Amino acid sequence: MENLSERFNALQDQLMNIYEAAEQTLQAQIKHWQTLRKEPVLLYYAREKGVTRLGYQPVPVKAVSETKAKEAIAMVLQLESLQTSDFAHEPWTLVDTSIETFRSAPEGHFKKGPLPVEVIYDNDPDNANLYTMWTYVYYMDADDKWHKARSGVNHIGIYYLQGTFKNYYVLFADDAKRYGTTGEWEVKVNKETVFAPVTSSTPPGSPGGQADTNTTPATPTTSTTAVDSTSRQLTTSKQPQQTETRGRRYGRRPSSKSRRSQTQQRRSRSRHRSRSRSRSRSKSQTHTTRSTTRSRSTSLTKTRALTSRSRSRGRSPTTCRRGGGRSPRRRSRSPSTSSSCTTQRSQRARAESSTTRGARGSRGSRGGSRGGRGRRRGRSSSSSSPAHKRSRGGSAKLRGVSPGEVGGSLRSVSSKHTGRLGRLLEEARDPPVIIVKGAANTLKNVRNRAKIKYMGLFRSFSTTWSWVAGDGTERLGRPRMLISFSSYTQRRDFDEAVRYPKGVDKAYGNLDSL
């Protein structure tokens, strides 16, 4: 107990000496954080041994000491990495290397030279908010190389430059929705207006594609700068398009004219083929019915002609001719004659009934009906049964998706009458993705953890990658990683199950192909 108190007091003395010396070297700041790391380690050990107080200092719970020790270790690693860069010999104060400064926006970067930026919303001086713009921002790229960038402010927000890319860490439009009602704000730096009241706008989404001419450097001039009328008109005219873009941010991408024309041609061809098939089927049915009717009417006519011919020769209606010149009386007395006549009468009745049915069926087919008696008589030439037609249509609807059709659908997939498999195949034509942005090691940890804990909730992961400037090889922004899915339902389940680490941003999208 006494030994722990003595060690704790010794650490307090070392910290007081560092604060009094106030050295502005990077080595002194590393020593400061190494001393701060020892303090929570000592308190953690004391709590583990059941000690609740060291002198006048209460011992916190182990979780608090563990968190502070980890923060100190992380700051030591960051400062030691900065010491190997070209900026190690610059003056560094306790404020520049504090955990509060390191965590302020932009988070995870060392910063110097704070400048106040005042933004007035709705032209109301009482409705104002203060922001901090840093003169210099020190950031590390994906290759663990440190860079020094200047900050600036425009009507969109506060940013720092990564090559030619403006990385915004404060957006005024977000707070305009929170604090204002008209969506207008005025930007002041050091109590001087640098941007007159402007309306809501958003920064362009493509890296390096922000062509804002109205920008202010970190150190403002004494002259008052305002947005000219031309740029203000451009901002106002672009506002509906930008609003529409934000509305479609997580939807499907707008289709090009060529893709739209190709889709319309495919649809018109499919409609033409379906119409031609239906016409050919109706023609074949009508032709078959008519030919059947003609044959039956011809047979009936021949039968009636034979009957009338026999009557004209003086035979009774019930007699029939079996051949030769035998007399009718002899034939009528023979037992085979009656059966033959009966057979002939039954054939004649069947012919008449079939002719009547054929005529009705032909009338039904001419009237547009595909069912009823006419359909039963023309089964060989008519279309298949409804059950067979449903199965055949279902197989055509649930066929596989070829590589050329992936991403070809420009419509939202309907959930009606397709089934689970049909919906998956339809959504395969426009596979959904999630793009995550953050530190490279953090994204790799997300990928490895998802492969262990969330297997089956995604399709595949990409490696970490970055945008590259168009006029050089410098990497722009934070590293990215793509996560692909088989369907929008799978993406939703993945997004609900996964908890992204702090500092990782996500966005939804879809691709024509993977």
Curated annotation (Swiss-Prot):
Taxonomic superkingdom: Viruses
Keywords: Activator, DNA replication, DNA-binding, Early protein, Host nucleus, Isopeptide bond, Phosphoprotein, Repressor, Transcription, Transcription regulation, Ubl conjugation
Record PTM: Phosphorylated.
Compositional bias ranges of the Basic residues kind: 248-284, 323-333
Major location category of this protein: host cell
Cross-link (Glycyl lysine isopeptide (Lys-Gly) (interchain with G-Cter in SUMO)): 437
Annotated stretches, region: DNA-binding domain: 430-514
Bias kind Polar residues: ranges: 232-244
Localization per record: Host nucleus
Biological process annotations from GO: DNA replication; DNA-templated transcription; regulation of DNA replication; viral DNA genome replication
Renumbered residue ranges of the record's region Disordered: 197-424
Stretches the record annotates as Transactivation domain: 1-201
Listed Pfam families: PPV_E2_C, PPV_E2_N
Annotated GO MF terms: DNA binding; DNA-binding transcription factor activity; nucleotide binding
One annotated Gene Ontology cellular component of this protein: host cell nucleus
Residue ranges with Low complexity bias: 199-231, 285-321, 334-346
Gene3D superfamilies named in the record: 3.30.70.330, E2 (early) protein, N terminal domain, subdomain 1, Papillomavirus E2 early protein domain
Family label: Belongs to the papillomaviridae E2 protein family.
Main function: Plays a role in the initiation of viral DNA replication. A dimer of E2 interacts with a dimer of E1 in order to improve specificity of E1 DNA binding activity. Once the complex recognizes and binds DNA at specific sites, the E2 dimer is removed from DNA. E2 also regulates viral transcription through binding to the E2RE response element (5'-ACCNNNNNNGGT-3') present in multiple copies in the regulatory regions of the viral genome. Activates or represses transcription depending on E2RE's position with regards to proximal promoter elements including the TATA-box.
Assembly description: Binds DNA as homodimer. Interacts with protein E1; this interaction greatly increases E1 DNA-binding activity. Interacts with protein L1; this interaction enhances E2-dependent replication and transcription activation. Interacts with protein L2; this interaction inhibits E2 transcriptional activity but not DNA replication function E2. Interacts with protein E7; this interaction inhibits E7 oncogenic activity. Interacts with host TAF1; this interaction modulates E2-dependent transcriptional regulation. Interacts with host BRD4; this interaction mediates E2 transcriptional activation function.
Protein name, as recorded: Regulatory protein E2
The species this protein was found in: Human papillomavirus 5
